[in-house]
Amino acid sequence: MVLCRTLDERVWMLNRQGKAAIVATAQGHEAAQMGTVWALKRGTDRFYIYYRDLAVLVGLGMTPAGIMLGFVAKAGEPLSGARQFPVHGAHADLGIVN
């Protein structure tokens, strides 16, 4: 949860510096989101995330670097190739459905 909060704060700072265009904070939702990940079975269940589910991505094993690529709209972002809203898209290996 600390990693999620730290990522959220960094992205917020990037937005204030003009380096990340869109930011929707997930602060205060970390525990509920991590609980959701732990309650479901990876590899069996599917995850339908929304734009504030940063902790779900971290809980499923997405790297902070991959998450940051989406916020700064760079190629290589694993969910949508940085073509959609940050923290939104699909990832077959993690069971994330768009």
What residue ranges belong to the model's regions?
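Cofactor-binding active-site loop characterized by glycine-rich and histidine/acidic residues
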Residues: 6-9, 13-98
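Mature N-terminal segment immediately following signal peptide/propeptide cleavage
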Residues: 1-3
